[in-house]
Curated annotation (Swiss-Prot):
This is 2-C-methyl-D-erythritol 4-phosphate cytidylyltransferase. Catalyzes the formation of 4-diphosphocytidyl-2-C-methyl-D-erythritol from CTP and 2-C-methyl-D-erythritol 4-phosphate (MEP). Pathway: Isoprenoid biosynthesis; isopentenyl diphosphate biosynthesis via DXP pathway; isopentenyl diphosphate from 1-deoxy-D-xylulose 5-phosphate: step 2/6. It catalyses: 2-C-methyl-D-erythritol 4-phosphate + CTP + H(+) = 4-CDP-2-C-methyl-D-erythritol + diphosphate. GO terms for biological process: isopentenyl diphosphate biosynthetic process, methylerythritol 4-phosphate pathway.
Amino acid sequence: MNAIAIIAASGIGKRMQLPGGRSKQLLEIGGFPVIHHTLKAFEDASQVTEVYIATKADNIDLLQDMARSAGFRKVRHVIEGGKERQDSVWNCIRMISDGHSGAGELPDAILVHDGARPFIRPEEIDDIVRLSVESGACVPGNRPKDTIKYIGSDPSCFGATLERSRLMQVQTPQGFRAGMLIDAHHRAAEEGWYATDDAALVERYFPDYPVRIYETGYHNIKITTPEDIPVAEAIYQALL
């Protein structure tokens, strides 16, 4: 069983309020860039054989040098991302498909992960690969701690309260059988249809394949706002 991982690392951190369009993946946690921790997890995952990174054009050489100096041998390609996250993932998928076009050359699974989620564990990655191959698709998540409400037709008022026991906060890496993800992205590109995560594409184009839930703890956070930095430092220390 083997998988290729796509790391989406093109975000410029608008909500992080970083000057000059600096990438949040390059912020340091525990003395290393966020994306260093991300790449190390996939380097240590036994089921992952290759890693593709989509990033800003200005960061391509920097990330290639970082991977080389850290000894991350699984990093095969660092390419320019697209306008939207989905475009960045599609750029990588096309490269994977072109490079593994022979009969039987596709990996068993493709994983898509946010570059700004540095604390996924290698054993969790391997579990997601296994469940993706078994079920077709597998997405990690955890249960919300807060009550979730709809916003009403009047955006200043709540509309309804959702049943919290039926909700999950979705994370990455999201895993899929390779052919399924490639086909879903290809069809979405043809239609010009965009979603906020890759699982939504598979749900749309492969409705007969329910997406498997893989429940994680609360360590697999995404670095998004300034308040996440001290939380990330605490998680890093706890995981040492």
